[in-house]
UniProtKB/Swiss-Prot annotation:
Site (Critical for insecticidal activity): P10, N27, R35
Top-level taxon of the source organism: Eukaryota
SUPFAM superfamilies, alphabetized: omega toxin-like
Protein name, UniProt field: Omega-hexatoxin-Hv1e
Protein's GO biological process: defense response
Localization, UniProt: Secreted
Domain-related comment: The presence of a 'disulfide through disulfide knot' structurally defines this protein as a knottin.
InterPro entries for the chain: Omega-atracotox, Omega-atracotox_CS
GO molecular function: calcium channel inhibitor activity; toxin activity
Length: 37
């Protein structure tokens, strides 16, 4: 079974995250990327 994605790492869907929450965050370059909460 796939392991969950830790907080702060890029994610496609909420279900992929250990926290079950993947939201858009702005990175240092001003780009918006979905990452686990």
């Amino acid at each position: 079974s796939p392991t969950c994605i830790p907080s702060g790492q890029p994610c496609p869907y909420n279900e992929n995250c250990c926290s079950q929450s993947c939201t858009y965050k702005e990175n240092e370059n001003g780009n918006t990327v979905k990452r686990c909460d």
